[in-house]
Amino acid sequence: MHNVKIFCKFRGGAVIIYLEIGEIMLKKDLNTKQVGNLFGVDESTVRRWAMSGKIKCIPSAGGHRKFSYNDIVDFANKKGIKLNISAENKNLNPKSAIPKIVENALKQDYKFVEKSLIELYLGGVQLTSLMDDFIEPVLVSIQNHLDNNKISVAEEHIARKIVSKGLNQFKLSVINTKKDNGKHVLTLNLENDIPDLPIDMIQILLEDEGYNVHNCGSHTSIRNIKSLISKKNYDAIFIYLCDRQCCTSTLVDNIDKTNSDLEEIIKLADKYEIKLFLGGPSFENINQKLLKSFNLFTKYSEALLINKIK
């Protein structure tokens, strides 16, 4: 069962809806009755909304309707209804949410991570803020635990995997991947960069904008990139250079290889007319001439600059 407690209050003529999501595993959608309770209307009203296209739904084989979190939030925004988390939940700011997510990631509880992200999203936190102000600081905090010898390398890797799993479960719950603007994007880490969480975060942001994202993940070689580009037309390539303990592409020992790979990618982009985006916390060791060929970003939200570049 979907363990969601719903509280409705009227304030200044507006309906404010509070949700308290239970500790058990979250379902990916709500039924007509649950949506009716959520908005304080009967089921027939929800059915009329759905039939008229006011609120999107997915019809099931048995004739029932399913409503995604994404579509519920979109509808609430259009109608001026404020969705909020239960007043008992005080974790809607980074200062209080981040330590709890880190704590549970270290406990290997991906369900808590997923639940927290969904609560934040339903509470009005934008996807861009979720990536910049919550998930990234969580990753920084986990790295700090490792740097301060509070956890082992293995524990750091597992905690990151837990965050990754929670994030991808969140994606399945709320991100509308049916949007399609007809554009294709390739996302990747270069060789010597192992973690793919930043690339996953960029993928979620781009897919929410309607881009078809082909995520190569980590440790992608130039040979593989050439193969992919020769077989499919891409509008843009996103590369992320990490500087954490398990990433070495920006270290002195590997920087020549990294610069060489970036130069090859620039040549491919020129040949196939592909826009280039390079993200990361720092580009200090990257050849400055090469950087001129990239649209640079240091925050995940800045990846959406792609919408403004012709």
Regions found by a protein language model. Give the residues of each.
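Short, intrinsically disordered or compositionally biased N-terminal tails of bacterial proteins
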Residues: 1-24
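A short, structure-level motif marking secondary-structure boundaries and short turns
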Residues: 18, 29-32, 86, 126-128, ...
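Polyanion-binding surface elements
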Residues: 22-45
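Generic non-transmembrane alpha-helix signal with a bias for helix starts/N-cap capping motifs
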Residues: 29, 42-43, 113, 199, ...
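Surface-exposed charge patches
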Residues: 34, 47-48, 118, 204, ...
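Long amphipathic alpha-helical segments
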Residues: 38, 43-47, 52-175
